[in-house]
């Protein structure tokens, strides 16, 4: 194992104490009992938050000690980061060892390359094939990757939507209760849900990497992480939840990969994006509370199926890693990791109904102006909502649209922001709507 932090400690405890992988315990009910013989760390003297069985496991500081050990069959990478982790993963595969990792950044950017390397190694030495497991890289406590690899082989997936970040789901839940963004961010940091630098979570970057992986598994097409339109939750306000409530909705940060329909020349194109989204309260995705995760898959055979569970944490993530280890050890890993339908068109100017909140200084003709600007932008307005105005110098109104392209909504918001009555750039987000 490379790395011995929170998740690595959980992996060690599950394997050595619960699966009987230590020399003093041998009670596993599995066909194969794994043993962690070496753990590579930067500082061997550092105190760990798990008890090491020194009779079974050796702490080392040089990864070559693992790579050169012919008795090691599987390398578990839980060190984090990208550069060192990538080098370690590639070197492990080249040395004939299977690899299990939880590294979403590595997988999101390099999955095609890793699978090509696995195939190359196996072609060179077919008598001892290597495997690659990465279940824990997305929604740590939900076996969503294995589900996509093996549960939809005879199906056609039309859409994957996921609440894949527990931190932002917790924060949005508190904002729905009336807590301001700044206060709930501090609370999330105090509870350990959010990092001191919360950018990856609140700006949607974490979800962006995860939906890139799920899109590859569901549709067989690689999507550059940087090309994915991504909006976080930093512009969401308590007032947005008030409007959402009046519409029978809540707000969730969702990663989406969808085959677009009703899109003219781009009909059938794949759109992948991350954004806060208005979700009806009776929708499957509205069920995720606290730091929980939900993934909803819409397919031809099953319709909509949802998968729910903890998205992160020591033992949920470690459990997914151990599940991969056991699949590798028992030779039950899927041989084809994703559908080979790589010719699908990518078009991230996605189509949706949209919610647009406009902050303005009250005056005559504002609704008419917004309607005219919408017409110029090719946007059809579905409804206009307004909470009672208590301050005419700083009021809000909400426009919901019929289905239109992201580029059209951005153009409309740019035009509105230039008007004298606009106090700020409009806040917009897609909606899950039946119309």
Whereabouts are the PLM-identified features?
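N-terminal Rossmann-fold NAD(P) dinucleotide-binding loop
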Residues: 8-9
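Rossmann-like NAD(P)H-binding beta-loop-alpha module
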Residues: 72, 122, 127, 133-206, ...
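NAD(P)-binding Rossmann-fold cofactor-contacting core
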Residues: 17-52
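Catalytic, metal-anchored helix/loop core of enzyme active sites in primary metabolism
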Residues: 58, 159-161, 169-172, 187, ...
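Rossmann-fold NAD(P)-binding glycine/threonine-rich loop
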Residues: 79, 84-95, 104-149
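Substrate-binding/catalytic subdomain of NAD(P)-dependent oxidoreductase enzymes
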Residues: 174-175, 183-287, 292-294
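A conserved regulatory-domain signal marking ACT and ACT-like small-molecule sensing domains
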Residues: 320, 325-435
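Rossmann-like NAD(P)-binding element
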Residues: 57-58, 63-89, 97-102
């Amino acid at each position: 194992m490379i790395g011995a932090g929170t998740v690595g400690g959980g992996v060690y405890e599950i394997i050595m104490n619960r699966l009987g992988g230590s020399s003093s315990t041998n009670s596993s009910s599995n066909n194969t009992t794994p043993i962690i013989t070496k753990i590579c760390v930067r500082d061997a003297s550092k105190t760990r938050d798990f008890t090491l069985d020194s009779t079974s496991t050796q702490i080392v500081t040089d990864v070559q000690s693992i790579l050169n050990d012919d008795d090691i069959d599987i390398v578990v990478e839980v060190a984090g980061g990208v550069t060192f982790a990538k080098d370690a993963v590639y070197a492990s595969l080249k040395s004939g060892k299977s690899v299990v990792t939880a590294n979403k950044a590595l997988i999101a950017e390099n999955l095609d390359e890793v699978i090509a390397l696995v195939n190359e190694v196996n072609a060179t030495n077919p008598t001892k094939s290597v495997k690659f497991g990465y279940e824990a890289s997305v929604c740590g406590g939900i076996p969503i990757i294995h589900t996509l690899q093996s549960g939809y082989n005879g199906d056609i997936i039309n859409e994957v939507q996921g609440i894949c970040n527990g931190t932002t789901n917790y924060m949005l839940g508190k904002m729905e209760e009336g807590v301001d963004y700044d206060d709930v961010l501090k609370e999330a940091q105090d509870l350990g849900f959010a990092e001191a630098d919360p950018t990856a979570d609140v700006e949607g970057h974490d979800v962006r990497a995860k939906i890139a992986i799920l899109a590859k598994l569901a549709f067989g097409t690689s999507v550059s992480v940087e090309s994915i339109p991504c909006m976080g939750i930093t512009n969401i306000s308590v007032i947005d939840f008030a409007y959402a409530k009046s519409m029978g909705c809540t707000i969730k940060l969702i990663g989406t990969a969808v085959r677009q329909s009703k899109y003219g020349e781009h009909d059938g194109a794949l759109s992948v994006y991350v954004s806060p989204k208005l979700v009806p309260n009776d929708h499957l995705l509205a069920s995720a509370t606290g730091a929980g995760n939900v993934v909803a898959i819409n397919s031809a055979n099953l319709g909509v199926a949802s998968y729910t569970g903890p998205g992160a944490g020591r033992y949920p993530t470690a459990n997914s890693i151990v599940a991969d280890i056991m699949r590798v050890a028992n030779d039950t890993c899927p041989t084809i990791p994703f559908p080979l339908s790589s010719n699908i068109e990518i078009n991230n100017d996605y189509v949706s109904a949209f919610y647009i909140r406009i902050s303005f200084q009250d005056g005559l003709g504002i609704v008419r102006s917004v309607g005219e600007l919408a017409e110029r932008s090719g946007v059809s307005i579905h409804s206009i909502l307004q909470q009672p105005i208590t301050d005419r110098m700083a009021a809000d109104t909400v426009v919901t649209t019929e289905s239109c392209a992201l580029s059209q909504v951005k153009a409309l918001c740019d035009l509105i922001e230039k008007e004298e009555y606009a106090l700020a750039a409009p806040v917009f987000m897609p909606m899950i709507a039946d119309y």
